[in-house]
Amino acid sequence: MFRIYLYLILAASVSALATDMIVPALPILQNAFNTDYSTIQLTISGFLVIYACSQLLSGFIGEKLGKLRVLTASFLLFLAGSILCFMSESLMTLLAGRALQAVGAGAGPVLSKAIAKETFAPLILKRALSDISSASAVVPLIAPLAGALILGHLNWNSLFLVMALFSVVTILLSPRALVHHDAAVVPSSSGFVTPAFIQGTLLVSLILSSLFCYISLSPAIFMQQLGLSTLNYSLLFSASVLFFILGNQMAKFERMINPWVLFIVNALSVIPFILGSHSLLLCIAGSMMFNLSLGAYYPTANFIALQIKGTKTGIAASVTGFIQTVSAGTISFFAVKLTDTGMGFDRTLGVSTLLLALLSLLVVTTLKVTQWKTGKKGK
């Protein structure tokens, strides 16, 4: 059990590792290849575009060829891309390697959830999703620091050697076969979509969009407007991640994850930003409660999104993964663009995340109404 648990956690974390570890190396890569910063940003932005498409495709391919087989093949692709990046002497070779990495990374977060759904009983599944979400949150916390430490002693291409080793370890942990707890389920020929799938997908998309807005706007708020140094902001961001992880672990306890309470707390937590408060203490407290409340419901939202008809969990997870990635990227992009109107970074963050919290409350309400109607019909 521990081996499959660790395997799924590593598989879910690969995309975060691939994007966050090279962030400290971007200025170094710019100098190494003698190019402008916007071009070198393609190593991240281009990666994310291909990664989103790979997420969508991997679920469909996994249903046809087998999820475990496709996941192993994807890590072999990621390994090949990492080696190509490690050996690259031109920008085009580096970008080609990153493209291969992105294709390989797309299957990890998607198929790990699908495999967890088919392998674990519902109670264990909720705990597994909490741990997978926590591990995925830890990687963005550790990866940039690890990248900076490596760059302090070795060349930039050593980062890709670490990624290659990560993929090798994950492949070695791959189980030979999967034990399905719900093997008696008969595949549905009428499609997999259920109201719960739609509502769960909307919820994870709204939650991730809120997080992306915070990640995009909080540096300007705390460093430019409130005067924190880069180091102090890094510590604050680390604390935010830790509160998100704490929320993930709270999700294991049913009594602690009332969605109405959590999203109301989430909405209230951004009031200091809406009011343009200059109190550093209030803004920090709001940030911590913001991340805690989102983290507490994120695993449950993923669990809801996996409640489908039939056994096409790979396709369902890939559709959810694609929608949440595209939604979060698009919404956070337009939130940042709003600052060009003179609205201010703090008020932009507050208003955008408040709207997302209210939309989440609306989705939760429709979810509960659907559950009530379904239960009533079944009686």
Model-derived features: where do they sit?
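Transmembrane alpha-helices of Major Facilitator/SLC transporters
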Residues: 233-254
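Helix-loop-helix hairpin linking two adjacent transmembrane segments in secondary transporters
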Residues: 122-175
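A late C-terminal transmembrane helix in Major Facilitator Superfamily
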Residues: 306-345, 352-353
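Paired small-residue
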Residues: 77, 81-84, 92-100, 281-289
